[in-house]
């Protein structure tokens, strides 16, 4: 037995922030329906809450928020007529399933890839039959984390693919999308999404004798089968397990079921406890792709007990008579599957919610010993919430306490008088729904008053760790997010300013140890990750500008090179872009015209309208080159934005190539050239900048330490401000995110629908100094267009870096549309995020990073939940 009443020594779990609904008098009653909550790999949280109107009509709402901006809530009228019982994100984090107590299932997807614009176009219905369990079909992708190989050089050794079959495959082995649900009457329903958009739905009984299903959960096997666990709610009844096989026969969905071994909770077989816990209140598989281990919780009105069970293959004794009749049987002992209890707790306070980790840590004894030896604790614990308001993190198998959080630590406004604080008499406010983040470093809970709380879960779980080991664990999880494409916001919660420099250096070191092909796949993602890390320390804030600018430069370079077309169809093995790079690398002449004559200029011919439409991007390249060269005399200042480019031969070479391309296009369309304000009318600004840029590039183009630029080059750069007007660059968009402003042990209290005045830090003050002030005219950061102080066009903003861009394109040329297509799903700060194909071999669409702004925003202003007994002030006549 495990005693959860004893807090773990040094357990580390603290509150990051809480977000509440607007307050009004007499609003202390709980929402009248059970809550559902889901956390996606994009760090989007969805949860349910009802609204009651003046005439007592109830609207079932689904609320979606980004953990970085929790106050910016988007509320969806779900059109569910009964209580929503289940919410489930897909693997890409861009689609959401909702199911209700009337058997209706809706599939929500993002409209225009906006995190605050959702639509439901497909769904299914089992009329009048409440849904008790819901899951997307497995896509066959399973990743294993090898903690013991965290020091290996290859990401392929640290994170390997596990052989796992999809629930259903299309022609060629592509996984078929769809969902499976279990109803309260014992039916299993499967809906398949065909590539044509058609939905195939089939419903079958789990067994011949249908019975009431109060609780159910769904898991998947490596062979492509589905396992469903059910309970009728009584601890005196067995927990049943079924194997479900899905197939498509003659364009129709077919479901086959088979009964598997069942179990009785051990607390019911103990004569002293037989009637103490009459109801099974929670039934969960320990992981979606681990059908051999299950967690059960039985409860009374005041207490609970938790048991962990494992399905094992055991030998079946055979009588000697049968061994003599059949020697083959004697050689190989037959086996059966049998449920065995792994661990159980002592009597606990009543459990109100359970949350399971999503980190794919193996739970075999060998792997658990390795995790213990390496002191890697993320993913080993599950969360239990109790009616007394506390939350316990317990080991997934042994159920030993790892960390404890008490709700008494919840923050209160500083100006709230003590006499006005509510008394503790009566039932404690407790979490009714919980979810762990995808790295198990954060937990979200919705309490009985509708308040949302986000907790940090320390990677050490209170165990004393060396600083180097703690950094290694965070680095390992950052690499995991880099490989999978998952958002790493929850990891940033645990990065202290003193860790940033080491983490960035070690992350770059691990990146350079990968193969060239993998480095190319991850090149933009690691820059975005470095930028988010550098925001957390005042010593590295200016690097954020450099990483952000490099992402933009890479995007411009790849887009402009892709516009080049070979003159003949039977092209050699190299593209025009590759030949441009090769020639510019080989020819080190400082005269731009001499470099240009070595190129096949016919490959650079574009339509005149296209060239003119690209002028804003070409202007940015020209301005950036001028700024870099003018800042060369101040290269000793590490705090100056752009400093890292002065020693980056790759980026300088990229700029040099673009200057050549711009020069050629300027001969075709002079009005597309960058505009410089020069003191002399006869000065060739492009030639001057190319000459200085080439000299600087020669100093650092080779691998190894860069040589110092000669004094003549520095002197020429000193003269630039007297020859050309140096532009002021917009280094960073304004961002009002939380993660860089959170302080340890100082939780924030926020309110839905009201942007807070967040406390500043040394890092955020520097960040604000590098961004445009709120009152200044806005700029479209991706199109480089000025929008004015109050834009009239609909805009969207990145939820991570704050980049603003117009929602609808003002351009019609194909080339510019190609540039804009790059930013439909994501922004600079999240470019490359989303499930990808480097290790996980997923080709799912990337999750968006934008929310809509402007006068026609689809954002619904959140209001206080109306599932309360008293009228809201706005509802009173």
UniProtKB/Swiss-Prot annotation:
GO molecular-function term, one example from the UniProt record: nuclear vitamin D receptor binding
Function as written in the Swiss-Prot or TrEMBL entry: Component of the Mediator complex, a coactivator involved in the regulated transcription of nearly all RNA polymerase II-dependent genes. Mediator functions as a bridge to convey information from gene-specific regulatory proteins to the basal RNA polymerase II transcription machinery. Mediator is recruited to promoters by direct interactions with regulatory proteins and serves as a scaffold for the assembly of a functional preinitiation complex with RNA polymerase II and the general transcription factors.
Main location: nucleus
Protein name per Swiss-Prot or TrEMBL: Mediator of RNA polymerase II transcription subunit 16
SMART domains reported for this sequence: WD40
WD-type repeats, residues: 21-71, 72-119, 120-165, 166-203, 204-257, 258-334, 335-415, 416-460, 461-495
Domain of life: Eukaryota
Family: Belongs to the Mediator complex subunit 16 family.
Cellular localisation: Nucleus
One of the protein's GO biological processes: regulation of transcription by RNA polymerase II
Name of the gene encoding the protein in the UniProt record: MED16
InterPro entries in the record: MED16_bridge, Mediator_Med16, Mediator_Med16_C, Mediator_Med16_N, Quinoprot_gluc/sorb_DH_b-prop, WD40/YVTN_repeat-like_dom_sf, WD40_repeat_dom_sf, WD40_rpt
SUPFAM superfamilies on file: Soluble quinoprotein glucose dehydrogenase (SSF50952), WD40 repeat-like (SSF50978)
Disordered: region residues: 848-877
Pfam families: Med16_bridge, Med16_C, Med16_N, WD40
GO annotations of cellular component type: core mediator complex; mediator complex; membrane; nucleoplasm; nucleus
UniProt subunit comment: Component of the Mediator complex, which is composed of MED1, MED4, MED6, MED7, MED8, MED9, MED10, MED11, MED12, MED13, MED13L, MED14, MED15, MED16, MED17, MED18, MED19, MED20, MED21, MED22, MED23, MED24, MED25, MED26, MED27, MED29, MED30, MED31, CCNC, CDK8 and CDC2L6/CDK11. The MED12, MED13, CCNC and CDK8 subunits form a distinct module termed the CDK8 module. Mediator containing the CDK8 module is less active than Mediator lacking this module in supporting transcriptional activation.
Keywords recorded for this protein, A-Z: Activator, Nucleus, Repeat, Transcription, Transcription regulation, WD repeat
Comp. bias (Basic and acidic residues): 866-877
């Amino acid at each position: 037995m495990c005693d959860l009443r004893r807090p773990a020594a040094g357990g580390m779990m603290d509150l990051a922030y809480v977000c509440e609904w607007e307050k009004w008098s007499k609003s202390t009653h709980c929402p009248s329906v059970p809550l559902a909550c889901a956390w996606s790999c994009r760090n989007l949280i969805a949860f349910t809450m009802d609204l009651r109107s003046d005439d007592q009509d109830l609207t079932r709402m689904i609320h979606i928020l980004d953990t970085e901006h929790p106050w910016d809530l988007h509320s969806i009228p779900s059109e569910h007529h009964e209580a929503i019982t289940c919410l489930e994100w897909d693997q890409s984090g861009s689609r959401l399933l909702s199911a209700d107590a009337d058997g209706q299932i809706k599939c929500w997807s993002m409209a225009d890839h906006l995190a605050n614009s959702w639509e439901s176009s497909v769904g299914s219905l089992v009329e009048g039959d409440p849904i008790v369990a819901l899951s997307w079909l497995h896509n066959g992708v399973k990743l294993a984390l090898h903690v013991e190989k965290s020091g290996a050089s290859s990401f392929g050794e640290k994170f390997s693919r596990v052989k796992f079959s999809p629930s259903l495959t299309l022609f060629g082995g592509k996984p078929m999308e769809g969902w499976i649900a279990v109803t309260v009457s014992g039916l299993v329903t499967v809906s398949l999404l065909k590539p044509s958009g058609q939905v195939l739905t089939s419903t079958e009984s789990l067994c011949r004798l249908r019975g009431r299903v109060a609780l159910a959960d769904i898991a998947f096997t490596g062979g492509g089968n589905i396992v469903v666990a059910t309970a009728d709610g009584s601890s005196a009844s067995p927990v049943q397990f079924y194997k479900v096989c899905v197939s498509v026969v003659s364009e129709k969905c077919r479901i086959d079921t088979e009964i598997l071994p069942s179990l009785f909770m051990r607390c019911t077989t103990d004569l002293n406890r037989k009637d103490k816990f009459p109801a099974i209140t929670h039934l969960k598989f320990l992981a979606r792709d681990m059908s051999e281990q299950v967690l059960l919780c039985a409860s009374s009105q005041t207490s609970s007990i938790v048991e962990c069970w494992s399905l094992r293959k055991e030998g079946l004794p055979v009588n000697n008579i049968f061994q003599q009749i059949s020697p083959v049987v004697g050689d190989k002992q037959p086996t059966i599957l049998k449920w065995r209890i792994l661990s159980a707790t002592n009597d606990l306070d009543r459990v109100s919610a359970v949350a399971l980790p999503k980190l794919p840590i193996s739970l075999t004894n060998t792997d658990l010993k390795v995790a213990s030896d390496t002191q890697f604790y993320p993913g080993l614990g599950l969360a239990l919430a109790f009616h007394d308001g506390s939350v316990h993190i317990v080991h997934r198998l042994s159920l030993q306490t790892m960390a404890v959080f008490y709700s008494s630590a919840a923050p209160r406004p500083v100006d709230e008088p003590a006499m006005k604080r509510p008394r503790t008499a009566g039932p404690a406010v407790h979490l009714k729904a919980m979810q762990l983040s995808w790295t198990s470093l954060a937990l979200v809970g919705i309490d009985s008053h509708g308040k949302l709380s986000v907790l940090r879960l320390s990677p050490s779980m209170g165990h004393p760790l060396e600083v180097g080991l703690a950094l290694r664990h965070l680095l390992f999880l950052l690499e995991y997010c880099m490989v999978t494409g998952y958002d790493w916001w929850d990891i940033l919660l645990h990065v202290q300013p003193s860790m940033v420099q080491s983490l960035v250096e070690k992350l770059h070191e691990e990146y350079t140890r990968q193969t060239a092909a993998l480095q190319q796949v991850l090149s933009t993602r690691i820059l975005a990750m470095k930028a988010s890390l550098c925001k957390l320390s005042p010593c590295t804030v200016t690097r954020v500008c450099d990483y952000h600018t490099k992402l933009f430069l890479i995007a411009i370079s790849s887009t402009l090179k892709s516009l080049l077309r070979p003159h003949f169809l039977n092209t050699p093995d190299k593209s025009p872009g590759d030949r441009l790079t090769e020639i510019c690398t080989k020819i080190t002449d400082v005269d731009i015209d001499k470099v240009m004559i070595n190129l096949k200029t016919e490959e650079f011919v574009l339509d005149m309208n296209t060239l003119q439409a690209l002028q804003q991007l070409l202007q940015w390249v020209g301005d950036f080159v001028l700024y870099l060269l003018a800042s060369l005399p101040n290269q000793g200042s590490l705090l100056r934005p752009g400093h890292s480019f002065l020693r980056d031969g790759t980026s300088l070479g990229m700029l040099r190539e673009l200057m050549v391309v711009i020069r050629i296009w300027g001969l075709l369309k002079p009005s597309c050239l960058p505009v410089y304000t020069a003191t002399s009318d006869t000065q060739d600004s492009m030639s001057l900048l190319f000459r200085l840029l080439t000299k600087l590039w020669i100093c650092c183009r080779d691998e190894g330490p860069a040589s110092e630029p000669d004094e003549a080059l520095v002197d020429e750069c000193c003269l630039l401000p007297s020859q050309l007007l140096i532009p002021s660059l917009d280094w960073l968009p304004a961002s009002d995110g939380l993660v860089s402003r959170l302080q340890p042990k100082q939780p924030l209290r926020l309110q839905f629908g009201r942007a807070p005045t967040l406390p500043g830090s040394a890092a955020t003050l520097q960040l604000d100094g590098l961004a445009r002030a709120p009152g200044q005219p806005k700029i479209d950061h991706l199109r480089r267009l000025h929008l004015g102080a109050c834009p009239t066009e609909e805009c969207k903003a990145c939820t991570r870096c704050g980049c603003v861009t117009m929602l609808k394109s003002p351009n019609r040329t194909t080339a510019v549309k190609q540039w804009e297509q790059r930013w439909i799903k994501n922004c600079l700060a999240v470019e490359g995020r989303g499930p990808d194909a480097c290790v996980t071999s997923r080709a799912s669409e990337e999750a968006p990073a934008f929310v809509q702004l402007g006068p026609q925003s689809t954002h619904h202003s959140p209001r206080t939940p109306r599932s309360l007994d008293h009228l809201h002030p706005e509802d009173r006549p």
